[in-house]
């Protein structure tokens, strides 16, 4: 599945001129692209991901807004949805942003489309990449539940995600791996399993971080999870402390909650 508008346009949900949560310890101009190849039942941007919120916007218009904000941000960050579905137009945008603003570039992805990532990395340097590791890659059935996929599809997806993570680690200076601690879907033990799997990949990146994130039932979350309570702050913190014992010392360990913001464990 790829969504390819004309090379001079992107299908977007909107943007935010200054964001403090998309790149650790930095301020970003954040752009949301529409559509996703996953159907996570807890997604906070579900209408965007499913294409209900979308508009076709010329790349030049986006660049103009970023140019106005460039003195107030460190990064130009693209998220979704799944941005790599529009990888060709995305590369065009990144190149124009770099040329006209000089900002560092950032991407948020589920890493399930390694061929799209390869195309992006072969055309432009992405300084920061955030990868949402939904569930243990060794457990396709659990990954399927968390990502809203059929198990047979997830069996192939987990291998593609692993490939995408490895590819990204070789093509960026700052890799931020994230997992959302979703009630009734993932336990602290599952997060520890994810951490062991990532640690075993022996990723070589100048800067690498793992972030345990709090689930919050925002307005955009589908009904099934909209009525659930947010993950307790203390559980998120304890889980981050637990996985700090798993990763090698070169990996930064963080947790993110509504109450505390971004907190580094080590």
Name each region found by the language model.
Residues 32, 79-80:
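A secondary-structure boundary/capping signal
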Residues 63-75, 84-221:
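Conserved AdoMet/S-adenosylmethionine-binding subsite of the radical SAM
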Residues 15, 81, 133:
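Fold-independent oxyanion-binding glycine-rich loops
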Residues 47-53, 143-153, 224-230:
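Short glycine-enriched, charge-decorated loop/helix-capping segments at active-site entrances
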Residues 47-77:
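Conserved alpha-helical substructure of the radical SAM core
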Residues 1-25, 183-266:
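Auxiliary Fe-S-binding modules of radical SAM enzymes
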Residues 4-6, 10, 14-18, 23-57:
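Canonical Radical SAM [4Fe-4S] cluster-binding loop centered on the CxxxCxxC motif
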């Amino acid at each position: 599945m790829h969504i390819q508008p004309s090379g001079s346009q992107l299908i977007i949900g909107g943007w935010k001129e200054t964001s403090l949560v998309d790149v650790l310890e930095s301020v970003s101009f954040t752009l949301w692209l529409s559509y996703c190849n996953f159907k996570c039942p807890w997604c906070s941007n579900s209408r965007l991901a499913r294409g209900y919120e979308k508009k076709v916007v010329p790349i030049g218009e986006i660049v103009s807004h970023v140019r106005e904000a460039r003195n107030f941000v460190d990064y130009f960050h693209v998220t979704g949805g799944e941005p790599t579905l529009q990888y060709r137009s995305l590369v065009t945008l990144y190149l124009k942003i770099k040329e006209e603003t000089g900002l560092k570039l950032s991407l948020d992805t589920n890493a399930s489309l390694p061929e799209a990532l390869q195309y992006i990395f072969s055309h432009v340097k992405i300084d920061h990449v955030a990868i949402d590791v939904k569930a243990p890659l060794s457990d396709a059935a659990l990954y399927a539940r968390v990502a809203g996929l059929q198990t047979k599809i997830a069996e192939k997806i987990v291998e593609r995600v692993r490939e995408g993570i490895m590819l990204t680690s070789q093509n960026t200076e700052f890799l931020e791996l994230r997992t959302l601690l979703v009630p009734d879907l993932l336990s602290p033990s599952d997060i520890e399993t994810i951490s062991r799997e990532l640690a075993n990949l022996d990723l070589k990146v100048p800067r690498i971080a793992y972030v345990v994130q709090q689930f919050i039932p925002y307005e955009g979350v589908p009904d099934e999870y909209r009525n659930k309570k947010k993950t307790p702050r203390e559980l998120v913190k304890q889980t981050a402390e637990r996985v700090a014992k798993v990763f090698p010392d070169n990996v930064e360990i963080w947790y993110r909650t509504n109450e505390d913001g971004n907190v580094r464990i080590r």
